[in-house]
Regions:
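A conserved ligand/cofactor-binding region detector
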Residues: 1-136
Length: 136
């Protein structure tokens, strides 16, 4: 994962705790949707840590900012994309398998936001991905 070392045991513990505190259930009692939410919250925690570091770096540098306005954004599903961007997809897949969970079944629980209906939405998403990849 970016900046934050991936700890498989910590990840598994966090997923179990999220199921427990969000739904008052054990992992074995949780539905696939609840497990998806618990995994998403765990990934969100890592993203937030990295986001805060980025924000502090931007405040120090005072860089130029680009704004892109679009009524459509076809970003697709976020969980798998975020795991890939964090460089942790394989490790998370392995951790989930150790918990008896299939990452593909978990990813299938996420609805596609479909914020648009065509080329402009896909173009907006490509612009965002490209700028992020180029560290803008």
């Amino acid at each position: 994962m970016i900046d934050k070392q991936f700890e498989k045991e910590e990840f598994k513990k966090s997923v179990k705790e999220n199921v427990k505190f969000l739904y008052r259930k054990t992992l074995e009692e949780a539905t696939q949707e609840q497990i998806f939410q618990a995994v998403s919250y765990t990934v969100k925690d890592v993203i937030i840590d990295n986001w805060l570091k980025s924000q502090k770096a931007y405040e120090k540098q005072d860089p130029k900012i680009v704004y892109y306005m679009s009524m459509e954004f076809l970003m697709g599903r976020a969980l798998g994309n975020n795991l890939i961007n964090l460089g942790a997809y394989g490790e998370v897949k392995e951790a989930l398998e150790e918990l008896g969970l299939d990452i593909n079944c978990i990813e299938d629980q996420e609805p596609d936001p479909a914020l648009g209906n065509g080329g402009l939405g896909r173009l907006a998403a490509c612009f965002l991905d490209s700028l992020a990849t180029l560290n803008y």
